[in-house]
Amino acid sequence: MTRREFFLSIASAAGARAVPTISQAPLIVPVHLVLDGQAKWRPEQLHYFWSRIWPEAVRDLASCGIRLQSSLRTGEVWRHSGREPEVIGLDSGVINFVISDRIPIEWDNGRALSGVTTRYRGYHLCMVALNHAHCHQIPLLAVNTCVHELLHALLQDIFESRPAGWRGETREFRIDLYATRLWLFHDGAAIRKAARIYVERLQSEVKPRT
C-alpha cells in the first residue's frame, strides 16, 4: 500500500470529508492555561511548546470552527508521595490546561505519559508533560499532544473513568483517529458537534478558584 492509499483509506473508513465551517460562528471553548511553577524544564522546551505544539493545536481546532479562548497564569503542581497530587491555580467553567515537565506518577503509573485528561476535584483538567509532548508526527500513532488531550475533553471522555485493558486502548485509538482526520483532512464536524454539548456541561459547573 502506498502512502497515498494509506491516507485515503483513513478518510474512507471514517467517512472523512472536510466540512466547511467558515460560514458558521466559531464555537468558543474557554481554556485556562496554567504554567506549573514547580516544573523543572529547559528554556527550549517552553519555546517548542509556545512556538510549535500549542499553535498547531489552535490551528487544527480553528479549522473545524472551534476557537480556544485562552487565559494564562502561573500555578503549581505539588507531588506528594503516596497520595493524589495537589494542583493550584484552577478555575471552574473552563478547561484547565496545565503545562508541566512531567505527569505525576499517581496519574501515569510510571509510564512517562505525554499528557493526561481528568476531572480533578470537580475541575476539568488537561495536563501535558513537556519532557514528552510533541507536535503531529505519525498519523494514528503520534499526534499533537495538546490536540489529543483536548479531544478527550471535547469528545466527553473526561466524564468517564478510563476503561481498563483493550477498551481503554480502543478509546485512545478513537482519539488519535479523530486527531488524524482533523490534522490531515480538516474534518472536524463530529468534534464540533460534541464540543458544543461539552461546553454547555462545562459552563454549568461552578466552583471557586483554588
Model-derived features: positions:
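N-terminal secretory signal peptides and thylakoid transit peptides that target proteins
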Residues: M1-A14
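Helix N-cap and loop-to-helix transition residues
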Residues: T2, R42, L46, L184-H186
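Polar low-complexity intrinsically disordered regions enriched in Ser/Thr and small residues
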Residues: G15-A18, W78, N96, L113, ...
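Active-site-proximal segment of zinc-dependent metalloprotease catalytic domains
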Residues: I88-P163
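Propeptide-to-catalytic entry region of secreted or membrane-anchored zinc metalloproteases
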Residues: F7-L8, A18-E106, F159-R162, V199, ...
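The catalytic-center signature of Zn2+-dependent metalloproteases
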Residues: H132-T210
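Positively charged, low-complexity intrinsically disordered regions
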Residues: R4-E5, A18, A112, L182, ...
